[in-house]
């Protein structure tokens, strides 16, 4: 089974560290993994021009083509975002909007895949829940089954407090516990339903 991870941070720092850690665990457990990082990439926002509705592809030619391929080939999808302005990054918002071109090909094109959310905030309550809710909403709109780590610490997904530092995120044992719980359920769903 294949898991596609999207690191929606414009930097190679805390969010990339967390999603890379998650993908390493999955790879060690026998999953094929692939990561797309937004750092250094160009993902332009959707123009809502409706070109995709008639032509079954997006008119914009940029690094989103790599995301389309990753989403289509994956059994599981992990969305990892830094919390920006209390929600997801602008990179992830553009990716979500541009997925419309896939839906224009087939409304059910992503249906039945398993989805997991990771949110990394500069402080403990910096908007991680709002970022998770946006990711979960995206999953539900596209028929992707959202998975959390369950109650008591990872209700919506894996939440981290980075204190805006790579050194500090490595000390976030609570965040790592939420990641481990969420990964456990993600693997269970992949093994049971895919």
Regions found by a protein language model. Give the residues of each.
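Cysteine-cluster motifs in flexible loop/terminal segments that predominantly coordinate metals
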Residues: 41-68
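Helix-loop-strand module that forms the ligand-binding subsite of alpha/beta enzymes
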Residues: 59-151
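N-terminal beta1-alpha1 ligand-phosphate binding loop
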Residues: 2-31
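Cofactor-binding loop segments of dinucleotide-utilizing enzymes, especially the Rossmann-like FAD-
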Residues: 6-10, 38, 120-122
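Flexible, glycine-rich phosphate/dinucleotide-binding loops
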Residues: 12-13, 42-44, 124
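A short beta-strand-loop structural module common to alpha/beta enzyme folds
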Residues: 32-41
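Glycine-rich phosphate/pyrophosphate-binding loop and the adjoining helix
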Residues: 4, 23, 27-29, 66, ...
């Amino acid at each position: 089974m294949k898991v596609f991870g999207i690191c929606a941070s414009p930097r190679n720092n805390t969010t990339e560290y967390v999603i890379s850690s998650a993908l390493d665990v999955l790879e060690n457990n026998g999953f094929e993994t692939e990561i797309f990082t937004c750092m250094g990439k160009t993902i332009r926002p959707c123009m809502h021009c409706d070109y995709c509705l008639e032509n079954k592809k997006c008119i914009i030619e940029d690094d989103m083509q790599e995301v389309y391929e990753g989403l289509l080939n994956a059994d599981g999808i992990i969305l990892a975002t830094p919390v920006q302005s209390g929600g997801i990054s602008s990179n992830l918002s553009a990716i979500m909007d541009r997925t419309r071109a896939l839906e224009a090909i087939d409304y059910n094109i992503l249906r039945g895949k398993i989805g997991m959310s990771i949110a990394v905030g500069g402080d403990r309550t910096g908007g991680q829940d709002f970022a998770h809710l946006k990711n979960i909403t995206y999953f539900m709109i596209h028929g992707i089954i959202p998975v959390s780590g369950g109650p008591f610490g990872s209700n919506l997904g894996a939440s981290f407090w980075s204190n805006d530092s790579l050194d500090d995120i490595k000390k976030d044992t609570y965040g790592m516990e939420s990641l481990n719980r969420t990964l456990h359920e993600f693997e269970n769903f992949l093994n049971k339903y895919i």
